[in-house]
Amino acid sequence: MCRRVFIAILFASALIFVAHAQDGPKNSFVLIIRHAEDADSGDGISPLGEKRADAYKDYFLNFTVDSKRLEPKAVFTAKDSKKSHRPRLTLEPFAKAAKLKIDTRFGNSQSAELAANLRANQQGKVILICWRHPYIPALLDALGATPKTFLPNGKWPGAVFNWVILLSFDQEGHLIPSNSRRIDEHLMPGGSQ
């Protein structure tokens, strides 16, 4: 009997901890994009992708939502792989113009580790992340967001390159659904579904 009570108390404590755990970095905004268009071959981006990457420079230097300027102060991209350097190449023009270093320590399957790093080290900032589209749902989930809220069927479509997911976090690091959304950046013709 005593053991059952102990287990019940332990379980209840775990539920309370989970209910109050923070989703993302406190007092922060996280912007998530997919890398620019793929080159026909190799690990880079296409000429259209290069135009998008260059357009992101001014777009994110002047990023405004609801009349509030949200210029990124931290930049993360998925780690380069043998097949793709696209996330890093997509944000290099912006990072150079903003004089920010790109953090490339986290690979595709390290969304939980990236989210933990953001919670621990990036509070009070606007954070820009460029990721590979099949792994964005896991990144959203790791930040306490429901992928189906932002992506059709909870997946980023393969042909879409022009969305920005904006996640807003309060002083406790909890997601603010009313201030979080998907934005169509309208930098290049086409791309949305």
Segments from the language model and where they lie:
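Periplasmic-binding protein-like
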Residues: 126-130
